[in-house]
């Protein structure tokens, strides 16, 4: 499962080479699901804004439903699932592996673990405020619910974590 950044972004319906290797994985026998989960662009305002106040919730449900559909249709092997992404895709990877152990491997690039800390240190904290519908001192519970760090003791999936030493959006200590 290849997760796009954003969340206000989308995967295009095209085969393209990218640093995430979707094209390469396909040539090696992998089926690659690149879902446009709720919060993605291109599906209308409601689809985009449904995510407000529900990060680490409905988009995770969408992604897991997509993986389940791939298994049910015989496209994916439940014993050989992997998940990964960069930026918001890394964040969602963290959320997913803190929620379930169905994936046998994970790759989290610049993936946030703690949304309160993210608000405090990133270069554009406004999106955290928008999705949590408040500041850390007014939306502490919401930010905790959005943060996979609080479920980190549930993570059993072997995971590679990628960081950028000079990343102003998701500093290395956040990944």
Model-predicted regions and their roles:
Residues 1-175:
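Serine-hydrolase catalytic core recognition
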């Amino acid at each position: 499962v290849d997760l796009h950044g954003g969340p206000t972004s989308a995967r295009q319906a095209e085969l393209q080479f990218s640093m995430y290797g979707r094209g390469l994985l396909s040539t090696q026998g992998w089926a690659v699901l690149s879902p446009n989960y709720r919060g993605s662009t291109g599906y209308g305002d409601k689809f985009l804004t449904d995510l407000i106040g529900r990060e680490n919730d409905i988009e995770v449900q969408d992604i897991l439903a997509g993986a389940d559909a791939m298994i049910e249709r015989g496209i994916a092997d439940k014993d050989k699932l992997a998940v990964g992404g960069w930026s918001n895709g890394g964040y969602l990877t963290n959320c997913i592996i803190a929620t379930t152990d169905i994936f046998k491997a994970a790759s989290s690039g610049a993936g946030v673990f703690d949304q309160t800390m993210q608000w405090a240190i990133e270069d554009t904290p406004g999106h955290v405020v928008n999705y949590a519908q408040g500041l850390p001192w007014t939306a502490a519970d919401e930010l905790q619910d959005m943060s996979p760090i609080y479920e980190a003791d549930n993570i059993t999936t072997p995971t590679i974590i990628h960081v950028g030493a000079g990343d102003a959006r998701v500093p290395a200590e956040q990944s």
